[in-house]
C-alpha cells in the first residue's frame, strides 16, 4: 500500500516493503513524524499526487519533506543533486510495480487465467494510483476503479463471514 516503506538493504539495493508506516505516523509527506520514505512519498515526489489537493484539499502534503527523505536513499545509491529524489521515487515505483506484477502473474498462473482481456479492479487508498502501471506491466485489458476505492476493503471486511477455527494438538 501507500504506507509501504522504501529502503536500502545491506548491499544498497532499493527495496519496498514489507514494513509500513501505516497512517500514523504515516509517510514523511504527512508531516506527522514519519521519517522513512514510503510509496506515498514517491507519488508526491513524482507528481502523481498533488500535495495541495490530497483528500480533496483537506490535507496538504509536505513535498519537500518527501524529497529530503528520498534524497537520503539517493545518497546511498550514489545519486547526487536535486533530481536524485525523483529518480529514487521513480525507481521505487518501478520496483513496486514489478513486485505486484510478479505476484499477480503467479496468482493468474495458478488459476490458469490468461490476463489479456481481463480487468484489474483497483481498491484501497493507493490502489488506483498503482493500477494503470500494474495493468500495463501484467498485460491486462484495463482497469476498473470503483466510486469509493478507499472504502472497498472496509466494506469487504464488514460483509465477510466471521469464522473461528479451534485446533488442538493430540
Show which residues each predicted segment covers.
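N-terminally biased helix-coil "hinge/interface" segments that flank
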Residues: 1-170
Amino acid at each position: 500500500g501507500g504506507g509501504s516503506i522504501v529502503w536500502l538493504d545491506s548491499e544498497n539495493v532499493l527495496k519496498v516493503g514489507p514494513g509500513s508506516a501505516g497512517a500514523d505516523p504515516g509517510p514523511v509527506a504527512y508531516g506527522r513524524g514519519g521519517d522513512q520514505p514510503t510509496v506515498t512519498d514517491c507519488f508526491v515526489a513524482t507528481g502523481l499526487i498533488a500535495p495541495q489537493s490530497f483528500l480533496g484539499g483537506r490535507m496538504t502534503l509536505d513535498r519537500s519533506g518527501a524529497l529530503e527523505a528520498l534524497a537520503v536513499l539517493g545518497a546511498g545509491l550514489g545519486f547526487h543533486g536535486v533530481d536524485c529524489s525523483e529518480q529514487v521515487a521513480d525507481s521505487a515505483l518501478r520496483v513496486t510495480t514489478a513486485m505486484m506484477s510478479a505476484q499477480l502473474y503467479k496468482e493468474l498462473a495458478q488459476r490458469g487465467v490468461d490476463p489479456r482481456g481481463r480487468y484489474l479492479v483497483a481498491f484501497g487508498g493507493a490502489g488506483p494510483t498503482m493500477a494503470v502501471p500494474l495493468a500495463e506491466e501484467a498485460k491486462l485489458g484495463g482497469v476498473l476503479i470503483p466510486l469509493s476505492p478507499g472504502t472497498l476493503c472496509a466494506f469487504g471486511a464488514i460483509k465477510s463471514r466471521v469464522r473461528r477455527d479451534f485446533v488442538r494438538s493430540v
